Amino acid sequence: MKKFFAHSLKNLFLSTTALFAASAFANNKLYVYNWTDYVPSDLVAQFSKETGIEVIYSTFESNEEMYAKLKLTQNTGSGYDLVFPSSYYVNKMIKEKMLQPIDQSKLTNIHQIPKHLLNKEFDPENKYSLPYVYGLTGIEVNADEIDPKTITSWADLWKPEFKGKVLMTSDAREVFHVALLLDGKSPNTTNEEDIKTAYERLEKLLPNVATFNSDSPEVPYVQGEVAIGMIWNGSAYLAQKENQSLQFVYPKEGAIFWMDNYAIPTTAKNVEGAHKFIDFLLRPENAKIVIERMGFSMPNNGAKTLLSAEVANDPKLFPPAEEVEKGIMQGDVGEAVDIYEKYWGKLKTN
């Protein structure tokens, strides 16, 4: 989950063409494009040892960065074999014919995915994607500075006593999601007036904001640089392992529900390898490693039975069903993404 990340197309083109040579797509190589810190490196090495497939692993920091690079690789006839877009980008990429169907018959471990996380509106029947990790964005509080019992709403971030103490994720849709929710508007609105009003609300928050961070949002909390703000539930889990004073709060208006997914681009050369890598990560013993090491809620029935009771029952790592139900998932806003980006740019330069 993550952020708007502006790149010049020139730089993207140069980096992309440099990355992919004509011989790069032999079946013994698999080009994976994923979020930072989403798969432990030793698991990647284990996959290569088992299959003989060399994984060329690259990372991105936002859906926008991933999408822009895939657009360029479509035009050059090269590209990645496996990508991990968020739900609203899956829908966008399906519409633009950027993804090919996943052959579920090749996935012996697909039954490990809980059924209630399948068949979502952004990809009915999961023809083009499967859930990798999911979670909720809520509020982190340092109990040494702030009583967590006094924090119940997203609106609490605007309290004047929190000047210079707030962290917001560096993700336009997430940040505007909060303001739109407080304004009583849909977080997926395409109405510019609604987005502008949300921007004006966020302007008033800026004196409180110490940083925008979507790289490792748990770090500023652990290091005491901020005392309250946005955080993903998995990052909150990792943060509390470092500092027991950090508490995670689900806001009464609802947290932000997100899901990042396996998807195979239409330009993929090693489609067989992509399926093998998906199935490898769906193994319960491997999913367990991802959950424990990375701190993300990986939907895997078998993995949950392998976890200690303390981890399996942690409400940060595995959000309660009522909070998931209350959470609102981001949807594709079409061309209105440019409106969000415009006001996001204004907000970040204030």
UniProtKB/Swiss-Prot annotation:
Molecular function via GO: polyamine binding
The Gene Ontology biological process annotation of the record reads: polyamine transport
Keyword DNA damage present in the record's keywords: the answer is no
| Cellular localization per UniProt | Periplasm
Q: Which GO terms describe its cellular component?
A: periplasmic space
**Keywords for this entry?**
Periplasm, Signal, Transport
| Primary residence | periplasm
State the name under which the record lists this protein. Spermidine/putrescine-binding periplasmic protein 2
Species of origin reads Haemophilus influenzae (strain ATCC 51907 / DSM 11121 / KW20 / Rd)
Q: What is the lineage of its organism?
A: Bacteria, Pseudomonadati, Pseudomonadota, Gammaproteobacteria, Pasteurellales
